[in-house]
Each structure stands twice: as structure tokens, then as C-alpha cells.
């Protein structure tokens, strides 16, 4: 079976842990009818991704899977050369390929990799290695031209990060003797040295007011939507990442993770980025939102430290919610808030609500606290940043403010 177009290679981590080629007849046929190194290097990818899935977050697994999969597909279909024989020039050629892949490798929507047919997994024909979507605020009128696909600088950096890590793993296991991706990175012509002033992706005070008021109105009208209000309030007020509210294989957020110290201060214990466990201060203004969400679930008062009720519970089914489901909740509130603000204030003032993602709530909360004058060190610790310098760079931008202030005094004459 000659492979002329890309097919998915690796399933989700939970399925990869119990992976047998017999369950994937198409892949089995592809590997049995092509050169032996295809299967060998597919297995290298499988071993590496199993390691990543076991030791890193689900988000990191998915990101590394995307990049390892693309790299192997390119080596099979386009380069026709084993990855342990690639040199620096070959990898720079791959970087060019990633910068402008063939339109036949580009899709326009999120798709599952595999579908189940008669008990076996087969490739989803609607899946493609690369994805090009309309900007969030322009989806209705945007026409997608795949020829104009270009990865962002972040996507390009992520590709190098993943493939360099892949090669490092293969070197440690004695499968490879060099890392062409590492050597090629500094000579990749598509990287841009970015020294721009970064705009914080956040909502204005007015936009946040519409989001909160909308969430309150929705919850008042339908008790099931108390969950939406709680999620919105928690992400903004407690500076949470969406994953920190989600159910994960190694962490299940519970009501008991809210706790009170001897001075009656409230805290929330979260399992965050880089497997870091931290405690976040919980302001008094947030407690009524916690209480009303608990009341909607039949839980009385504020949580006790030994309470094991799921923090954000599914309405149907058991257990906590995934990051994907939580994002949908946030998006539903943003959409309604955008509609409300458009009606009252006009489209221009509401535009950011069309662009916003769940992570903007974390940025919004932190930015507002800085404007309020709260000590940067305290905000940094609540955010879970490794250093206060990170918080300053992202939110305060002290040096840029000094430069802007001094720049105002320049004269024309």
C-alpha cells in the first residue's frame, strides 16, 4: 500500500498505552507494504510519546504528538529517508515544509484522528496534519485560502522544541547518534527576533462587567448555569488556568481543596503547570459565588477541608470536567455577553469579547489586581509564576512604560 497522502499515526495517550497494530488494519497494511524502517521509526515515536504521556500533561502529549506525527509523515512520504540519517540541511528543508505545507496536508477544522468501524480503528478522512481556521472574530465572513497558511512563531518554536526532545530521547536510548533539529534551529530562516511591545490579552473593566452580569443573569434564569457563573468567576478572580479546574489523570479538583487557615483566611489548593502544587488566596468577594454554586448542587455553606465532592461537576455523568468542556462553558458566556454588549455599546466596544479565550480571564484578573495596587510579589505567587520578573514582563512591562514615558518628550523641531 503506497502512502501518497498523510494519515494519522498515533491515538490519544489512553489508547496508545494499549496499542496493537492488529486493531488498526490500515496502519498495519501501510507498514507491512513499505520499507522496514517505517515501522521501526513509528515504534520510536510510540515509545517517546508513551514516555511524554506518562510524565507530562495531556496538553503536552497532544502538542508533541502533533509534531512527531508530522515529522514522521514527512520523512515517510516527502523525504523518503529515515530520521536517523537526516542532516542539518534535511531538517532545514523540513522547516521550509512546515512553513508552507502542501494544501493537501491542511484541514480547516478540528477532527478526531480515528473512527471505529466494525470494531477496528480506521483513519478519519477529514483529518489533516495541519490546520487553518478563520480568526475567531471573523468566522462568519472569512474565506479560508489554504495557500496562505503560515505557522505562527509560537507554532514554529513548538515544532523545534518537540522534535529536539524526540531526538534527545532517541539519542539517550542509542537509536540515534545526533540531533539535526538542535543544530538547524539557529539557522532556520523563518524565525523572527521579536522585540515588540506585547499587548496583554485581557478584557477591559467594562467588558468584564458585561461577562459577569451575563453569567449572573444566565444563572438566575437557569440553576444548571450556576456552574457557568462559578467557572467564570473562579478563572478571573483566582487567576486560574483552565486546566487547573479540570479533571486530569493525576489530579481531581475537589471542594476540599478550598481550606481555611487559623486566621480564617481562605485558600485554594491547585495542581498547576510543571506539576507544581500551590495555594492561591481566595478573596472574601469570591465566597458568595462559591456558596451559591454549592447551593445549586445541594451542598450547604462553605466547603470543609475533608470534603471530596468534585469541584466542577458534570451535569450528566460522573466525575469532573475536561478542559475542552470548560472552554465551551466559558465560550457560551462570552458569546452571550458579546451579544448583550453589541446591543448596548456597539460592535466596536464588544469586539474583544469575540476574540477572547478562557485564558483571557486569568490575564484580566491579574491585570486588574496590579492596577488596584496589590504587591506584585503576592500576585506572582497566586499566578504560580517561577519568578516575579515573569509577572512584571507579562503584566506590568515596567521597562516599556519607562521607554514610552521618555519617548513622549521627543520634539519635531
Identify the function of each model-found stretch.
Residues 393-413:
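DNA/chromatin major-groove-contacting recognition/catalytic segments
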Residues 247-292, 298:
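Conserved tyrosine-mediated DNA breakage-rejoining catalytic core shared by Y-recombinases
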Residues 328-381, 385-388:
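Short, basic (Lys/Arg/His-rich) helix/loop patches that form interaction surfaces
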Amino acid at each position: 500500500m503506497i502512502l501518497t497522502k498523510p494519515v494519522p499515526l498515533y491515538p490519544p495517550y489512553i489508547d496508545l498505552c494499549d496499542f496493537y497494530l492488529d486493531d488498526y488494519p490500515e496502519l498495519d497494511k501501510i507498514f507491512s507494504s513499505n520499507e522496514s524502517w517505517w515501522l521501526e521509526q513509528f515504534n520510536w515515536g510510540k515509545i517517546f510519546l508513551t514516555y511524554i504521556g506518562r510524565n507530562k500533561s495531556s496538553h503536552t502529549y497532544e502538542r508533541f504528538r502533533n509534531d512527531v506525527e508530522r515529522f514522521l509523515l514527512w520523512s515517510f512520504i516527502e523525504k523518503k529517508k529515515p530520521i536517523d540519517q537526516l542532516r542539518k540541511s534535511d531538517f532545514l528543508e523540513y522547516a521550509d515544509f512546515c512553513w508552507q505545507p502542501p494544501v493537501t496536508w491542511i484541514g480547516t477544522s478540528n477532527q478526531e484522528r480515528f473512527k471505529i468501524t466494525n470494531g477496528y480503528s480506521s483513519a478519519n478522512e477529514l483529518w489533516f496534519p495541519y490546520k487553518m481556521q478563520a480568526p475567531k472574530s471573523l468566522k462568519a465572513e472569512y474565506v479560508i485560502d489554504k495557500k496562505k497558511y503560515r505557522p505562527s512563531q509560537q507554532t514554529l518554536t513548538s515544532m523545534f522544541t518537540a522534535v529536539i526532545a524526540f531526538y534527545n530521547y532517541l539519542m539517550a536510548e542509542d537509536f540515534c547518534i545526533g540531533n539535526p533539529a538542535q543544530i538547524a534551529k539557529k539557522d532556520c530562516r523563518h524565525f523572527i527576533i521579536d522585540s515588540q511591545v506585547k499587548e496583554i490579552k485581557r478584557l477591559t473593566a467594562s467588558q468584564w462587567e458585561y461577562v459577569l452580569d451575563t453569567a449572573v443573569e444566565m444563572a438566575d434564569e437557569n440553576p444548571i448555569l450556576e456552574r457557568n457563573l462559578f467557572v467564570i468567576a473562579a478563572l478571573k478572580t483566582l487567576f486560574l488556568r483552565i486546566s487547573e479546574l479540570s479533571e486530569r489523570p493525576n489530579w481531581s479538583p475537589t471542594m476540599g481543596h478550598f481550606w481555611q487557615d487559623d486566621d480564617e483566611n481562605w485558600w485554594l489548593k491547585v495542581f498547576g503547570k510543571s506539576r507544581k502544587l500551590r495555594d492561591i488566596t481566595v478573596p472574601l468577594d469570591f465566597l458568595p459565588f462559591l456558596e451559591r454554586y454549592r447551593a445549586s448542587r445541594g451542598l450547604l455553606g462553605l466547603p470543609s477541608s475533608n470534603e471530596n465532592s468534585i469541584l466542577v461537576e458534570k451535569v450528566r455523568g460522573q466525575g469532573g470536567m475536561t478542559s475542552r468542556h470548560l472552554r465551551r462553558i466559558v465560550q457560551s458566556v462570552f458569546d452571550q455577553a458579546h451579544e448583550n454588549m453589541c446591543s448596548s455599546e456597539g460592535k466596536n466596544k464588544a469586539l474583544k469579547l469575540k476574540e477572547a479565550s478562557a485564558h483571557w480571564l486569568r490575564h484580566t484578573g491579574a491585570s486588574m489586581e496590579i492596577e488596584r495596587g496589590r504587591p506584585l510579589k503576592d500576585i506572582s505567587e497566586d499566578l504560580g509564576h517561577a519568578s516575579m520578573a515573569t509577572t512584571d514582563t507579562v503584566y506590568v512591562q515596567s521597562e516599556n512604560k519607562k521607554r514610552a514615558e521618555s519617548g513622549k518628550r521627543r520634539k519635531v523641531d
